[in-house]
């Protein structure tokens, strides 16, 4: 087999090395006459270092590069530490290899040295490609035609090979320009720049800086809004004074560091949207040709290197079925690269927030993450905690997709799989890339599209005190019982309007009315905003003459945790307690210490450790996550009203439910626990599931026993 590789950058050279490592003949076709790179640093994380180790190149990389001890996040103006991600030996033990910072030219050189001269043709530009049943053909600018069995497009974001497969496609500008520079060590004396990722974050701008040659050469990447740079070309040397103006208010150490730049060049931050197909017959794409991404998460080169190993491995196993091998390569890689593309864009958005309230919210989230994720696995693990050498030996379906779900995970029943798929496709890559804004919009779309309010149901906007809510009554309800319901969404997404259909079934279950509450959401409104709103809403019901003995407090996921926290707060304040609590898969432990958070991570289409960390930290921020009003699992549960709690076997938050039920029972609470099989997180919001019908019937019977009829039928506020 002979594989033609279009492009001799990091992806192309690594592909050549990987294929030769597996005994496959290669020819790299590179248009540049010399393999060199513009002076810049590059980060090679554990996921990529593991592959280079297989080639015997890690020692060479270690000899010329730097192993940073941490990523230190600082405020650009004050220099105050915001967050620290430990690296060094600690990260090497955690991820299987260290992180390396290296000069891009040094990396290209060591890769090029591993590819013999006869396997490279430089100064050779590809202008056309074609294929037939027997092989592929590349036409060069000289009109020479080169034949092979496989063509791999490693020719970057402007790929000729991609254009052949897919036609011209739009690439997107992130409206960010990056100033890059390399500074000799002698110009940085006295600045105490340790062998760490020294990062500064300001409104709409960042400084990503680190050593690329030990105590010899320092790399700076300064990102700024595009409108702050006035020039016709973004590809050559820039005006240093223009860069410095963008960092006028930087703290002294950062400012002095920038002043040591003797030359800078500018690049734009571009990307393409994820695609669902990059292979056709004997031709495939790799690296930026397939999945160009913004340069964050230390992921761009790493994904190319992972691609290269996967491609080589599957081709070596399926040499008699080249098209099938290339499709398997795509199947194994596409879910992961799509996830990294979306995650990198989300990181860019997060780190370039420009409005002061959003900067405050982001920094608050980092405070929270430092409490429950001190090793920064949520921030970096999605890219780094992956061993492609091991993964390619397992089933393709084990790879995690955009939402952190194992791509091949399936349920046994048709109805269960229907609910599973609704969760699986609720959040698109574009939604994820927009951070909590995108997740919020997507979750409301998911709920309102799939669970519309049925005809005949009365739903009206209301206010409980100062808290917005919806009042829902199902047809034919007669009693004056009331459900006070709190929607789920990790305290960060979700809305009362999105839960109207479920609220109508809750109202029917108690033969009364359901108020679903629009409590304030994080990160804009961290703790105690949600609990304050919950208390106000409950007291507003009492002020309308509704008896506590006729109120059922309800919630799913974070809403279930909030319902429990509400009752704890009411007990402490001496308020009358509601008659009962319904908690569906409650998010009751925001420290994420439950064993199923780890055990079922990747099996749950609705929740995973990274998402729960992001959401939980957004809510409690600088507050203690073990506070029972944040994590009611840690509260004194004695004296709570009767509790009906339910969850699905195999879901991430299962252990929150089971531990809560166990602790409540030990405290003397009247507990009803129902666990269902082969289902999904907060299964009760899916009205078509048989287990939903069964559970809601049980809840109705249970509620009849626990609630006392209210003498005054509740009315919406005028």
Model regions: which residues?
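Conserved N-terminal helical subregion
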Residues: 1-3, 20, 45-184, 227-241, ...
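N-terminal cap/lid segment of alpha/beta-hydrolase-fold proteins
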Residues: 435-476
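Active-site substrate-recognition segment that forms the wall
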Residues: 195-229, 244-247, 269
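Alpha/beta-hydrolase superfamily serine-hydrolase fold, recognizing
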Residues: 461-718
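N-terminal targeting or regulatory segments adjacent to alpha/beta-hydrolase or S9 domains
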Residues: 399-449, 712-718
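Conserved mid-domain beta->alpha element of the FAD-binding
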Residues: 8-33, 152-153, 179, 209, ...
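C-terminal helical "tail/cap" subdomain of flavin- and related membrane-associated enzymes
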Residues: 63, 313-409, 428
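Short beta-strand immediately N-terminal to the catalytic nucleophile in serine-hydrolase-like folds
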Residues: 6, 153, 286, 553-555, ...
